[in-house]
Structures are given as structure tokens and as C-alpha cells.
Amino acid sequence: LDASPKITSHTDRRESLVGSDFVQTTIQVGGYKPSTIIDFEIPRQYGLKQTIADTLGIGGIMRGLRTIPVLLDIAKDIMEVCPKALWLQYVNPMCANMIAINNSFPEIKTVGLCHSVQGTAEMLAKDLGEKIEDIEYLCVGINHMAFYKKFEKKSNDGPNEDLYPRLKIIADEIVNDEKLSSRSEKINHESDKILHEKVRYEILRRFGYFVTESSEHFAEYVPWFIKPNKEELIEKYKIPVDEYIFRCEYYSELWNEL
């Protein structure tokens, strides 16, 4: 792009906003400790299992209560310092945060974003043994709950190939704990995530479309997978309870190494 970016750091937020055409937020208010830990520990005492707990449920509610006031402070600064900027908002709980921002500061141009659309497209391409650059898709829905209405392999000499029939072969086999067969020669048997996506492949079997959000997220968005006294569902669908805690520990170690 022939760009020569200059990266600077600031301890004053308003100073960092001066002259901005775009603003991006990726923050975790309260940090991993103590806030996120508490979001998991207290519900666990009452038998409530969570995987990510940043979008809905008790964890999502508490995160929203911590986060919305901070985002509204940022919104106020944007209005005063760079009112024409486009705000790219990545902080969860996304829907609650965006409702608060849009209701309080409707003049601000802002959009709530997540990496899940492009990330899942790459995952599905890998599961199928295809290159992502050969894939064409149409995704519809809301943040953290969108579906691929179309997932196709591009063709230069005819109509695109609908890849859903091949994805449904994978779905039938992994959900039923069958060994991935050679019924489709292009199934990628070595995909490292495929056996940990049973929730989403089950949803594909039931609804006919693949959802963008990860299996660990989706498992706590709907009432079908994490249930009281139904531990066998967690085992069957390989649902990683407390997954976000493990991720935070992992990334904290990486940061400490840096």
C-alpha cells in the first residue's frame, strides 16, 4: 500500500485520539484478575458452568456492567476530539456494548466487530482441504450468531461448487464419533480442530447452516449443550468448561515471556 505508518504510545487517551480517522477498542475492564476469575468462581459455586462468559449469562452481564461505563467515557472523548472518526469496536459483550454506545451517542459512527467470520471461513476451508483464497461465502446474522448462507468453491469455467454437502459428511461422522472416512476424498483428516467443533457441526446437522461463533461460545448461547445433571453432553460434544480461564493463563504466560 506504500504506507509508512508511525506507531506512538500515549498515557493520555484524549491525546491519542487527536486527528484520528479511525478508533479501535480492544480492552478488558477489570483484567483477568480479579474480575474475570470472579465471573467464573461465583457462578461455579451455584452449579453454573461457563466456557467463555463474556457475552451473556452471569459472566457477560457482569462484564457489561464493568465495561459500558468505560466505553461511554471513550465515546465522550471521541465526540469531543475526533467526532468524524469511525469507531471499530471489538469489546465484549458486543451487543450490550453497542446498544449502550448507540443509545448514548447516536452521532458516532461505530460498528461492532469480531474475527469469527473470517476465522471460521479459514477453519472450514482447512477442514475441507481447500485454500481459503478459493472460497466464496455469504454470511448473515448478528455478531457472535451469524451463519454462512453460502459456502462455495470458486470455479473459473462454470458455477461454483456448493461445499455444504461435503461439510455435512464431516458433521455426520464427527458428531456420531465415527472415524473420518474416505467418503469425501477432500476431507482434511489432519485438521487439528475438527474433532473439537462438535457443537457447531451438530448445529449444521440440525439447521443446515454453519454458525460463525466457536463451539465453546455457541454451547453457552443456547440451552441444549450445557445442562444441569447432563455431564454426558459436555463429554460427548467436547465442551471446554472454564476455557476462558485457561486462555487467560496461557496468554499471561506469553506476555510475561515477552
Language-model segments: what does each one mean?
Residues 4-6, 84, 107, 134:
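A generic structural signal for alpha->beta connector loops
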Residues 2-3, 79-81, 130-133:
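Secondary-structure transition/capping motifs at alpha-helix termini
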Residues 129-258:
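Long, compositionally biased stretches enriched for glycine and/or charged residues
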Residues 29-105:
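Rossmann-fold NAD(P)-binding glycine/threonine-rich loop
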Residues 90-154:
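Rossmann-fold dinucleotide-binding core
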Residues 1-19, 26, 31-35:
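Conserved N-terminal Rossmann-fold NAD(P) cofactor-binding segment
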